[in-house]
Swiss-Prot record:
This is Probable phosphoglycerate mutase. It catalyses: (2R)-2-phosphoglycerate = (2R)-3-phosphoglycerate; (2R)-3-phospho-glyceroyl phosphate = (2R)-2,3-bisphosphoglycerate + H(+). InterPro entries: His_Pase_superF_clade-1, His_PPase_superfam, PG/BPGM_mutase_AS, Phosphogly_mut1. The keyword Isomerase applies. The keyword Hydrolase applies. The active site is at H10 (tele-phosphohistidine intermediate), E88 (proton donor/acceptor). The record marks H183 as: Transition state stabilizer. Homodimer. Belongs to the phosphoglycerate mutase family. BPG-dependent PGAM subfamily. Pfam families: His_Phos_1. Its EC number is 5.4.2.11, 5.4.2.4. The gene is gpmA. Keywords: Glycolysis, Hydrolase, Isomerase.
Amino acid sequence: MVYKLVLIRHGESTWNKENKFTGWTDVDLSEKGVQEAHEAGKRLLKAGFTFDIAYTSVLKRAIRTLWILLEELNLYWIPVSRQWRLNERMYGSLQGLNKSETAAKYGEDQVLIWRRSYDIPPPALEESDERYPGNDPRYAKLDKSDLPKTECLKDTVERFLPLWNDTIAPTIKSGQKVLIAAHGNSIRALVKYLDNIADDKIVSMDIPTGIPLVYELDENLKPIKHYYLADESELNAAIQAVANQGKAK
């Protein structure tokens, strides 16, 4: 039995466009991001994909990306599960700061550590900060211990895995075709887990916006292969654009 799982990072957001650390800030798609999502849906349709259920975060840039995909696929009717555990990594007090300006101030190496290291989080938010999730009604029912003030990728992996193990993996094994529309770091968390990527190797992995990533999994949900629905030159350009975000100008 071969299962297919499709992952997609949301299309470009307004803060991606402005090169800002976004994290749990609920910004929308840019005009380019909307176009990326429509193109991704068309690619999935052309490649013959269909889905029984979709998972996304509780942040509008991922939700809107999913809506557009389902529109292109004529699958508005399938169940959609919005899960806070699929949220982007919480960037703490960096949220809202321009990445290039932060790199110029603290150095590219420090920003790379904050953005891409596995176990070093950025500076944390205070609970009194309006950016703290405890001040957002969408998280009102969560235990306070689940609300991050900052996260490294290790924290994001640990936050995501219960959702994978308890909900998404059993759904895939039941034979349902699953689509996940999420964020760069929540997808990196899953990719790291699926491919068993070493902590020091995941640092250099970039997930492009708006390009479907297909995993073919065996009966134990171990990867057989994975591929993007994009040609090599387009994919490389998209990945490089993400990699350049943390560099000083």
